[in-house]
Amino acid sequence: MKAMEGKIIQVLGPVVDVEFESYLPAIFEALDINFEVNGVQKSLVLEVAAHLGGNRVRAIAMDMTEGLVRNQVIKARGKMIEVPVGEEVLGRIFNVVGESIDNLEPLKPSLTWPIHRKAPSFEQQSTKTEMFETGIKVIDLLAPYSKGGKVGLFGGAGVGKTVIIMELIHNVAYKHNGYSVFAGVGERTREGNDLYFEMKEGGVLDKVALCYGQMNEPPGARNRIAFTGLTMAEYFRDEKGLDVLMFIDNIFRYAQSGAEMSALLGRIPSAVGYQPTLAGEMGKLQERIASTKNGSITSVQAVYVPADDLTDPAPASVFAHLDATTVLNRKIAEKGIYPAVDPLDSTSRILSPQMIGEKHYEVATGIQQVLQKYKDLQDIIAILGLDELSEEDKKTVERARKIEKFLSQPFFVAEVFTGSPGKYVTLQETLEGFGGILEGKYDHIPENAFYMVGSIQEVLEKAKNMKNS
């Protein structure tokens, strides 16, 4: 047996124990095995997770382990799992070990990077807070993202998480000329498939790299896929000096797969059955998502909240890292207002006069106050009707309804379905529009003119057309 070869001594589902004669592979080192199942040649990559003593290691498989038997020869790679990086990954789908899985010509990468890397040091990190303009009115106004920040995207099934993700990818590609990386962490294969074809239709595929480790895969693949995607994003930040957008769908599944791996490795669980290292594992991933003096990685992470319990250790460990939250609300979607972002529930760390300026802060808080007052008046309106309100309250209700409508916006990626052309609204236009509504400049314009438009100029044109017709 060659020095770097070992043999399998035990297979426990996705966990494989291997014994080496003289060589001891390091933690996180990759192991390779080629074997045959029912006449089909298969290759499997494993990652060393623990040293058991006496040249024995316990490794986590990155794919199914059926067909493995004891005494099979397994080879240490002498390095970690490495994945392709660079512009050649754009428009392609990869699995956790960096193989293309989109049935196109297999990629022969000219450059690969290991998936486990150090987070940027304090000296490398950029400390200035800069707003990241998305072109989506409700986000830029009420819960702005910061460059290199982390955003939690909360929402149930079918309220439009994917559409917002696609619109952000589109806007980053066309307005900031940047790239995006999408990591599908333990989500449905069907959703991954839909996303690929929707991106193809929406024309954003050539600006994004997709990495999928879906629900049906072993915990090792579901956990490490987040690092695969992050490594691709880090290349664009560190080597190309770009501002990259990184999507993780779903960050809860990263914690969940970590809990499965932890149990398989025989570690004693902590609260609610999660791994004892939950906070550390979450930090290891999140700390790599940062702004450096070269470029930035801004991440949008979809967060599934099990049983709507925000105190569950997994979502709670994510909250500690988030700079902004974008909450999608089904009630808003039912009104036909898209994006269905809840203007009162969504938050941002940078929504303060020091960070975004006095004007933006005043307009944003003014809008929230009007919407909150409208929410408080809902019960009175339901019981007594609008006529019983004071003149001032009637004005508040009118303005709030206009604001609600004006928070809707036609998306570029939804053009195919809605037929209305998408709109990118600059922050300047957003502030001008909402500031004008608060000042009462547009009290004479019917509220329907505010629905599904971009800037306030379009509202005025729409109102003019409505009047003429």
Curated annotation (Swiss-Prot):
Pfam families: ATP-synt_ab, ATP-synt_ab_N, ATP-synt_VA_C
Catalyzed reaction equations: ATP + H2O + 4 H(+)(in) = ADP + phosphate + 5 H(+)(out)
Keywords associated with the record: ATP synthesis, ATP-binding, Cell inner membrane, Cell membrane, CF(1), Hydrogen ion transport, Ion transport, Membrane, Nucleotide-binding, Translocase, Transport
Location in or out of the cell: Cell inner membrane
First-listed, main subcellular location of the protein, grouped into a coarse class: membrane
Cellular component annotations (GO), alphabetically ordered: plasma membrane; proton-transporting ATP synthase complex
Enzyme Commission designation: 7.1.2.2
Molecular function (Gene Ontology), one example: ATP hydrolysis activity
Top-rank lineage group of the source organism: Bacteria
Residues reported to bind ATP: 155-162
UniProt xrefs under PROSITE patterns: ATPASE_ALPHA_BETA
Effect of residue 363 to I: In strain: CCUG 17874 / NCTC 11638
Membrane topology of the entry: Peripheral membrane protein
Family listed: Belongs to the ATPase alpha/beta chains family.
HAMAP family, sorted: ATP_synth_beta_bact (MF_01347)
Function field: Produces ATP from ADP in the presence of a proton gradient across the membrane. The catalytic sites are hosted primarily by the beta subunits.
Quaternary context: F-type ATPases have 2 components, CF(1) - the catalytic core - and CF(0) - the membrane proton channel. CF(1) has five subunits: alpha(3), beta(3), gamma(1), delta(1), epsilon(1). CF(0) has three main subunits: a(1), b(2) and c(9-12). The alpha and beta chains form an alternating ring which encloses part of the gamma chain. CF(1) is attached to CF(0) by a central stalk formed by the gamma and epsilon chains, while a peripheral stalk is formed by the delta and b chains.
Name listed for the protein in its UniProt record: ATP synthase subunit beta
Organism per entry: Helicobacter pylori (strain ATCC 700392 / 26695)
Gene: atpD
